């Protein structure tokens, strides 16, 4: 039940407290101990992790230490089994990221399927540390067993290739949120940094939102235009998320969420 899940989880795109971390200089020891205690007991979910892309493109194995490893675009890796364990995190949303280039050239759905496959293969390879989760009950059980939940979220709504049937199939495969765009406007939703052509969400885009509500899939408004954010809020009957965005009042960028939307 995704409504229960929305209450249960704490989305934490960046979470610095870890079991193995030493107390920062100048920190209050009592407050630090209390923070660690809360963290250990809480269910903490990271809303967006791009590690499936190098798992697929670079054959990266999660058992390999990530220090000194880099994505093809030069960004450093932050994820491996030992870091997951040290962090005390309950779960990670593995990003099924589909480049906007594939919206233009074709192959978006296949790319999503490839990343879903590589994610499942990783959890099957390391069953002692990882477990695939799709429900709140799964997450609670993983926490109890000391395993990390692997969840999945699609980044780029064009991965469904304008098919509600494909959306339903992705849900059946375990996808539990979808970011409606990435950095390109597509057939039914406008991106934050691209030329709009739908005045927000198209009629079909609103159908997508309603079907995601029916399925129990989170609607993710990271990367979308502010008009899309407001359209989603008008249409959705369920809670929405911004899986990896900040507050625009604190960092004035179109990727971030304005006070008006908040």
Where would I find each of the regions flagged by the language model?
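N-terminal hydrophobic targeting/anchoring segments and the immediately downstream early-domain regions
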Residues: 19-197, 252-262
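Sec-dependent N-terminal signal peptides
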Residues: 5-14
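Histidine/acidic residue-rich metal-binding segments in metalloenzymes
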Residues: 36, 162-172, 194-241, 254-262
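Short, catalytically relevant binding-site loops at active-site mouths
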Residues: 226-227, 247-249
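Histidine-centered catalytic micro-motifs
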Residues: 44-51, 224, 242-245
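Acidic, glycine-rich active-site loops and adjacent beta-strand->loop/helix elements
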Residues: 98, 246-247
């Amino acid at each position: 039940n995704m409504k229960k899940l929305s209450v249960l989880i704490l989305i934490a795109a960046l979470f610095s407290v870890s079991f193995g971390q030493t107390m920062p200089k100048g920190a209050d020891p009592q407050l630090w101990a209390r923070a660690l205690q809360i963290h250990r007991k809480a269910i903490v979910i990271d809303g967006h992790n791009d590690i499936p892309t190098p798992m697929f493109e670079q054959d990266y194995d999660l058992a390999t230490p990530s220090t000194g490893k880099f994505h093809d675009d030069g960004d450093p890796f932050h994820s491996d089994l030992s870091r997951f364990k040290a962090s005390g995190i309950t779960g990670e949303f593995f990003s099924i990221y589909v480049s906007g280039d594939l919206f233009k050239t074709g192959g978006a759905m296949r790319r999503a399927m490839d990343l879903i496959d590589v994610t499942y293969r990783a959890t099957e390879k390391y069953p002692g540390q990882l477990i695939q989760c799709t429900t709140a009950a799964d997450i609670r059980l993983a926490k109890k067993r000391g395993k990390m939940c692997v969840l999945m979220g699609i980044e780029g709504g064009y991965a469904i290739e304008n098919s509600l049937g494909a959306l339903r199939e992705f849900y059946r495969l375990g996808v539990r949120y979808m970011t409606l765009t990435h950095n390109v406007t597509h057939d039914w939703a406008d991106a934050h940094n691209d030329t709009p052509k739908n005045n927000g969400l198209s009629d079909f885009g609103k159908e997508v939102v309603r079907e995601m509500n029916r399925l129990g899939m989170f609607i993710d408004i990271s990367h979308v235009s502010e008009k899309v954010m407001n359209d989603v809020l008008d249409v959705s009957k369920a809670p929405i998320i911004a899986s990896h965005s900040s507050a625009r009042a604190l960092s004035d960028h179109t990727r971030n969420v304005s006070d008006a939307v908040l």
